[in-house]
Amino acid sequence: MTDQVQLDENKLIAERRGKLDHIRQACKANGHPNDFRRDSLAADLQSEFGEKTKEELEELNHIVAIAGRVMAKRGPFLLIQEVSGKIQAYASKDVQKELKEKYQGLDIGDIIGVKGALHKSGKGDLYVNMEEFVLLTKALRPLPEKFHGLTDQEMRYRQRYVDLIVNEDSRTAFIIRSKVVSAIRNFMVDKGFMEVETPMMHVIPGGASARPFVTHHNALDVDMYLRVAPELYLKRLVVGGFERVFEINRNFRNEGLSPRHNPEFTMMEFYMAYADYNDLMDLTEAMLSQVAISVLGSDKMPYGEYTVDFGGKYARLSMLDAIKMYNPEHAEIQALTYDGVQDRDLMVSIAKSVHVEVESFWTCGQLLEEIFGETAEPKLMQPTFITEYPADISPLARRNDNNAFITDRFEFFIGGREVANGFSELNDAQDQDERFKAQVSAKESGDDEAMFYDADYITALEHGLPPTAGQGIGIDRLVMLFTNTHTIRDVILFPSMRPQA
């Protein structure tokens, strides 16, 4: 914002404060009345009366009470915006005179209540004839388009309230988000899942490979961690006999910001006993198709230059096969087998050849995943399940019966990014104990995203976890697809931001 723009804005703010002082003195009140009640929304009026003729409305003389924010002034008409949409109000010359005397006129951004008969203009637009009116809230700051428009992306996120006022696309995105969450919840309940809530603060962080946020509980005098995932608590509930559970809630990971990452994000995580990861993939196909149709009216939606198709069966590829598919000219990759994947020197060589910066503590499985992420993941635009994840990067997943190097795990990709992660759960307490210990060793070697050892979870497994499959779905990333947006900040109301200087 230039110095001149700032001066102009400060001048307008001072003028509006002066108007509010005038209102307070004239009304002998605080200038913020709270006794107006609206009885109609713009969308409902359009639905009920939009097809009626001008003459029919005049004959009806239907009186309505509306309220909202003044977004434009066009001669005697005010454009009023509220949660359902916009509608015009007509101010006669007498009303305009009264507005001037009582409020020194209305400004863009003011919130008003209006009562009067519903009419239709010559152009066919509904409007309310202002017979009674009240200024409910004086807007002291002008809306941004008065000066330069809300074009600063950072300002959109820092002042989301302003973004929502002036940007219809933003409002629509968050309405879609709400509908997506509701549709998922309804789907899960219909499938016999029970919604639960598990702790947000953990004594031992677990359930995902991620760096946690640390806090301190004063009364207990103990460090605690904001949860990185609810997984271990949800599986404790399955041990306890709740065979189908789900939770939609926040996770926290003390990691960087990117178009795909926010330290605080929403996950839907669920577990079902007597099922495996194949059942999860089938359930995911049914869920996303139903949610898309429920929210958007179609199981096909635009995403960038693509059309994402949520209908039917989705592609299923092993991680190794996906790497081979998207590296057809790379001889070493084309010749790679699972025996070769376990040759660390070979994997380091291949990783470097595809421009992966290798960390010294990475395992063979991590190297395979990084090669996949560099060469294949960005190309998975249509819904795709990637399977056969190595055991050394899947510490909570069940080993494959035919190949102990891999697990019965998948990650689900759309639009070139991971949206979900699921697997047949490891319910062998002894194997889980050994994998936790391997994670502790990895942490000691410098991997700060490796998991902690959770002795109580081992105790829970020793009581017996039935054959179980579980999955987490990133709500924010899923909503990015439904809203055709390409940064996670556009679908989180108040994303994390660096402090302003």
Curated annotation (Swiss-Prot):
Chief place where the protein resides: cytoplasm
List of residues binding Mg(2+) 1: E411, E418
Localization annotation: Cytoplasm
Gene3D superfamilies, sorted: Bira Bifunctional Protein, Domain 2, Nucleic acid-binding proteins
Classification lineage: Bacteria, Pseudomonadati, Pseudomonadota, Gammaproteobacteria, Vibrionales
Organism expressing this protein natively: Aliivibrio salmonicida (strain LFI1238) (Vibrio salmonicida (strain LFI1238))
Subunit structure: Homodimer.
GO molecular function terms attached to this record: ATP binding; lysine-tRNA ligase activity; magnesium ion binding; tRNA binding
Assigned GO CC terms: cytosol
GO biological process, one term: lysyl-tRNA aminoacylation
Family stated for the protein in its record: Belongs to the class-II aminoacyl-tRNA synthetase family.
Annotated positions binding Mg(2+) 2: E418
UniProt protein name: Lysine--tRNA ligase
